[in-house]
């Protein structure tokens, strides 16, 4: 019998990059797209690798940056994952509460 494996990936913007003044786009490019001088190695690359082997992954997405950047940034993360047939689950980093504007 083959070994069953559950592949998951924490998918989140960097609170440290935010603290250092990175724009939402720069944070997305670094943290989600995984942009490097050698190419992109983020969630798109990860899904490509999984799909090349007939696999699907589970991406644990942190929605908390929406408190700072708005909901669209989370939609931009979740959309490609779901459109490619992968799974999205909840992953939370509460430090974003410290950055959220007060009501």
Residue ranges with predicted function:
Residues 1-103:
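Catalytic alpha-helical scaffold of carbohydrate-active enzymes acting on polysaccharides/glycoconjugates
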């Amino acid at each position: 019998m083959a070994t069953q494996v559950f592949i998951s990936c924490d998918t989140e913007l960097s609170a440290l990059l935010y603290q250092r003044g990175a724009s939402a786009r720069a944070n997305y490019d670094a943290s989600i797209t995984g942009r490097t001088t050698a190419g992109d190695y983020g969630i798109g690359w990860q899904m490509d690798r999984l799909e090349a082997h007939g696999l699907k992954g589970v991406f644990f997405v942190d929605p908390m940056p929406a408190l700072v950047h708005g909901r669209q940034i989370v939609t931009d993360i979740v959309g490609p994952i779901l459109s490619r047939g992968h799974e999205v689950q909840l992953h939370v980093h509460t430090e974003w509460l410290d950055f959220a504007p007060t009501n």
